[in-house]
């Protein structure tokens, strides 16, 4: 048989790398039902607790009554409705950029932006730990592709010396598996000095960072001249779905003309855009959500330190517990689930071999008591894992 899929699947099972889809049988929130089991979840990207907010739900209902269900066509045919346009205007205002362009998913936004901006004869340089969609965009662009050392401006500068054609430097804002933040001011300086453009995917920073929720760039005070291409997602802190690119008038017009993932797909349901508008309003107005989330992050890190857990250098909602071996990470995840807690084990190839981890994600919807329940369970389960290895 030409395609021996059974052997590939068996090999993945044997390496403790087999993935399965848990079945969510409740709305998003800290308290969920998964595969029939009530659980306290610490693995959602609903950072501000907006995915099940009653005002956002009502906005979707009202949007469906006014605009119907489907987008009907691509944006360039007859699928670009008033709610879509209003979301783009709100996103441009939130991020302090001239214009925004709405995409159906973050993956499509990253592929669309990179492949529209660089091609054969050009160069794309990426952080080694970038999200898969960024790496795929670089590979598919046809440009000369290279990765610099993680969050290392000197490594980037060295690779820029060999760059040809138009050069795009691409980085995550908040790295999704480590939770650390890119040194954007230094990366922007290096890129600008060599005539390159910096593109930042701030999927995990938007909404959670910055005084107004504008993300990591707002926190650093960086403008469109520092970061010409900014990507954000709407399915995380915003609680809905979709993604966007913000930047100059010329950038957005270029993407409308050349970004194939934008051109050749049906637009999102207009009702979804109505829900997103309400979520963006809450994201900006409810500053207590960011303040509460920051307090939970401090609580978790201090508690984890007392237990003796190995954490990554993260002060964001993503708090990975480094385990190392994939089998041990799975074992700890199972022990927590037996105690009613859902924390996902992240294994290769998502992370490098030998760096499997439990990826704890915190939300403004969590309470201090719920975070303490997680810490108590970790204090009980982690020593059991260590003693089993002894």
Swiss-Prot record:
Annotated catalysed reactions: 6-carboxyhexanoyl-[ACP] + L-alanine + H(+) = (8S)-8-amino-7-oxononanoate + holo-[ACP] + CO2
Residue stretches in coiled coil: none
Keyword Transmembrane helix found: no
E.C. number(s) listed in UniProt: 2.3.1.47
UniProt-recorded name of the protein: 8-amino-7-oxononanoate synthase
CDD domains linked: KBL_like
Task performed by this protein: Catalyzes the decarboxylative condensation of pimeloyl-[acyl-carrier protein] and L-alanine to produce 8-amino-7-oxononanoate (AON), [acyl-carrier protein], and carbon dioxide.
Record-listed N6-(pyridoxal phosphate)lysine modification sites: 236
Top-level taxonomy: Bacteria, Pseudomonadati, Pseudomonadota, Gammaproteobacteria, Pseudomonadales
This protein's pathway: Cofactor biosynthesis; biotin biosynthesis
Keywords: Biotin biosynthesis, Pyridoxal phosphate, Transferase
Native source organism of the sequence: Pseudomonas entomophila (strain L48)
Subunit structure: Homodimer.
A GO molecular-function descriptor: 8-amino-7-oxononanoate synthase activity
Positions of pyridoxal 5'-phosphate binding: 106-107, 176, 204, 233
Pfam families in the cross-refs: Aminotran_1_2
UniProt key word Transferase: yes
Assigned protein family: Belongs to the class-II pyridoxal-phosphate-dependent aminotransferase family. BioF subfamily.
Cofactor: pyridoxal 5'-phosphate
Positions annotated to bind substrate: 19, 131, 350
GO biological process: biotin biosynthetic process
């Amino acid at each position: 048989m030409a395609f021996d899929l059974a052997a590939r699947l068996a090999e993945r099972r044997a390496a403790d790398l087999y993935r399965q889809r848990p079945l969510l049988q409740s709305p998003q929130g800290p308290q969920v039902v998964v595969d029939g089991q009530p659980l306290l979840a610490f693995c959602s990207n609903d950072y501000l607790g907006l995915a099940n907010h009653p005002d956002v739900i009502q906005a979707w209902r009202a949007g469906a009554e006014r605009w119907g269900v489907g987008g009907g066509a691509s944006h360039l045919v007859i699928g670009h409705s008033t709610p879509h346009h209003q979301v783009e205007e709100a996103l441009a205002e939130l991020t302090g950029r001239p214009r925004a362009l709405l995409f159906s998913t973050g993956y499509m936004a990253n592929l669309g932006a990179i492949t529209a901006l660089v091609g054969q004869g050009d160069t794309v340089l990426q952080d080694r730990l970038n999200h898969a969609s960024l790496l795929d965009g670089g590979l598919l662009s046809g440009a000369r592709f290279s990765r610099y050392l993680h969050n290392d401006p000197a490594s980037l500068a060295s690779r820029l010396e060999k760059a040809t054609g138009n050069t795009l430097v691409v980085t995550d804002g908040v790295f999704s598996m480590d939770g650390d933040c890119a040194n954007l001011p230094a990366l922007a300086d290096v890129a600008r000095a060599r005539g390159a453009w910096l593109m930042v995917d701030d999927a995990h920073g938007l909404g959670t960072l910055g005084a107004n929720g504008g993300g990591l760039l707002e926190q650093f005070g960086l403008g469109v001249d520092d970061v010409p291409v900014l990507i954000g997602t709407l399915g995380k802190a915003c609680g809905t779905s979709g993604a966007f690119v913000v930047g100059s008038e010329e950038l957005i017009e270029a993407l409308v003309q050349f970004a194939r993932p934008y051109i050749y797909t049906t637009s999102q349901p207009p009702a979804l855009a109505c829900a997103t508008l309400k979520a963006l309003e809450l994201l900006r107005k409810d500053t207590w959500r960011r303040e509460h989330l920051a307090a939970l992050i401090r609580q978790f890190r201090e508690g984890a330190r007392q237990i003796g857990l190995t954490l990554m250098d993260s002060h964001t909602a993503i708090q990975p517990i480094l385990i190392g071996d994939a089998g041990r990470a799975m074992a700890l995840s199972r022990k927590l689930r037996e105690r009613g807690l859902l924390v996902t084990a992240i294994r290769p190839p998502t992370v490098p071999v030998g760096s499997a981890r439990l990826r704890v994600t915190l939300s403004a919807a969590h309470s201090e008591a719920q975070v303490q329940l997680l810490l108590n369970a970790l204090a009980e389960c982690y020593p059991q894992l260590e003693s089993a290895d002894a």
